Amino acid sequence: ISRSIKHRNAKLMLPCPIHLDLVVTMRALSSRNTQSNIVLRNEIDKIRLLFRKDRESYLCFYRILGFYPHNIQLYEQALLHKSTSVRSDKGRPLNNERLEFLGDAILDAIVGDIVYKRFEGKREGFLTNTRSKIVQRETLNKLAVEIGLDKLIKYSTRSSSHNSYMYGNAFEAFIGAIYLDQGY
């Protein structure tokens, strides 16, 4: 069985079927645009995934994100509630609070940009109130549940430090992880 592939006005006959991902990768290699680089990066990450011991974690995050994480520890940390007793190599508590701080700032900036462009001519007070309503904890809690973060958060059932905003906080931390992992 042979498969015919057209590439830049040339016709290549291959003696056996090839995996479509290889075709996508080759097209990305031949192009220099940003979208192609993203496709290529994702294809390379898929290949690396085959050799990882923590494949399931990567696949889980891929289902949520639509791309493979480069630094999976960031995403795992984003899902560690402060009630866990996990410690870093240096003995410091390891949780999602710092990533939450970063994610909160990023969400404010992104939503602020969208609101600014969407409501041209509106005054600052209106823009601030609109942004605040969009990034409020109840909304972030719902978003976290919609994408399935609520099932992945690690927390201590013995601690009384749970709050009704745990999911929204994890969502913000997840945004912070994406920002650090994918660049800015």
Go through the PLM ranges and name each one.
Residues H19, V23, R27-Y184:
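RNase III-family endoribonuclease catalytic core
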Residues R8-A10:
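Short hydrophobic alpha-helical segments enriched in small aliphatic residues
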Residues I1-K6:
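Short, low-complexity, intrinsically disordered N-terminal modules
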Residues M13:
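Nucleic-acid processing machinery
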